[in-house]
């Protein structure tokens, strides 16, 4: 069984945590960016798996852990250090966070300088109007049905 471990870190502690994971042989899996619509801040989620430790755990009890580093409360203009010097495979994720969310990721090893995606609106994932938010919330509500189920099923 897979177990997920979430560790919240600050921007200042990100590189030291990544360096520690690299030191024990953890592999980078993915990075996910999202915007908090309530306060406008951003969150980054970095996922790693320590393959060596996972093999040992699976052999013992069938379990293994996915490790996640969570950086929350990021202001759009705050500088976020790239982890690409430790994990070069992060480059598409960091470029995506820059292009779609407008996040200021610094010192990327492979930096597309805003041209990783061709988008018609700059930073499209950072924009949400009150109308769009209301429409999303409305579409999430399930319609209620007053008709008894046996009539709907033809019983």
Model regions: which residues?
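Terminal low-complexity/charged segments
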Residues: 1-155
């Amino acid at each position: 069984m897979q177990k997920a471990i979430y560790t919240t870190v600050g921007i200042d502690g990100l590189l030291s945590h990544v360096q520690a994971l690299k030191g024990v042989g953890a592999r980078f899996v993915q990075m996910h960016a999202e915007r908090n619509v309530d306060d406008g801040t951003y969150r980054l989620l970095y996922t790693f798996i320590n393959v060596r430790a996972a093999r040992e755990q699976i052999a013992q009890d069938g379990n293994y852990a996915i490790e996640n580093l969570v950086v929350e409360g990021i202001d759009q203009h705050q500088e976020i250090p790239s982890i690409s010097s430790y994990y070069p495979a992060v480059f598409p994720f960091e470029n995506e966070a820059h292009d779609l969310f407008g996040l200021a990721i610094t010192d990327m090893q492979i930096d597309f300088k805003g041209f990783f995606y061709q988008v018609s609106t700059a930073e499209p994932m950072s924009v949400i109007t009150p109308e769009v938010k209301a429409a999303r919330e409305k579409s999430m509500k399930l319609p209620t049905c007053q008709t008894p189920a046996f009539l709907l099923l033809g019983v």
